[in-house]
Regions:
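Contiguous, well-ordered beta-strand patches that form the walls/edges
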Residues: 84-86, 151-193
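N-terminal glycine/threonine-rich, aromatic-flanked beta-hairpin/loop signature
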Residues: 129-166
Length: 216
């Protein structure tokens, strides 16, 4: 007959085994498949000189999945978008830089409380936009909101021109009229449950215009 100590030990071992299986499954699911690289970009991504970067990325992804309170679909979709950008690289420096940038993103999801942040990705015709845009709406306090954004460009550009930043501060009462402090662009934000519509009448500010879906 099992005593309580034995039962607790079995429960602990079962839990550890389950966690181990989950980690293994996640690592396998998100590990870059280098079993048969059939394109020029995949051959470069799967080369030995990026082995350490691939392993490091896999470990950070599993950690983010297990620890972060960010929505799972957000982790998955941003990872897919990142991989598409990675495949556009034309130099070893670009590949290494993109691995490091993705690891920074995963660390952000892991280290910060995401429960007070709403994440939005831009959609076109029911699909994530071909030129991806990611907006984050942070509830800093009951009367203070911070909106950050990033519009992705060519990863082969210089680091400072690989993306377009967005930054604004507002209040719950003034959430519809937003000014991007980065470029002095004025936008109309229409929050409607799972959908965010962004409009502007200013020329040169169109990059962030569009329809976004929330990740929750």
């Amino acid at each position: 007959m099992l005593v309580n100590t034995d039962i607790n030990l079995i429960k602990t071992l079962s839990t550890l085994f389950s966690i181990g299986c989950l980690c293994s499954t996640l690592a396998h699911a998100q590990k870059i498949d280098c079993s048969s690289p059939n394109t020029s970009s995949m051959k470069k991504i799967c080369a030995e000189n990026l082995a350490e970067s691939r392993e490091k990325l896999t470990n950070h992804y599993v950690t983010a999945f297990l620890v972060s309170d960010a929505p799972v679909h957000l982790l998955e979709d941003t990872h897919t978008l990142w991989f598409k950008r990675l495949q556009q690289c034309k130099s070893l420096a670009c590949y290494k830089q993109q691995f490091e940038l993705r690891i920074e993103d995963l660390n952000f999801y892991t280290s910060l409380n995401q429960s007070l942040t709403n994440h939005y990705l831009k959609f076109e015709n029911g699909q994530i936009a071909s030129q991806p845009v990611h907006l984050q709406v942070h509830q800093l306090s009951k009367d203070r909101i911070k909106i950050e954004g990033i519009a992705y460009r060519n990863p082969n550009n210089k680091l400072e021109t690989q993306s377009i930043p967005f930054l604004a501060y507002t209040t719950p009462e003034q959430k519809s009229e937003i000014t991007d402090n980065e470029h002095d662009c004025k936008y109309q934000f229409d929050f409607n449950k799972a959908i965010l519509s962004v409009k502007t009448e200013q020329k040169g500010c169109e990059r962030f215009v569009g329809v976004y879906r929330i990740y929750d």
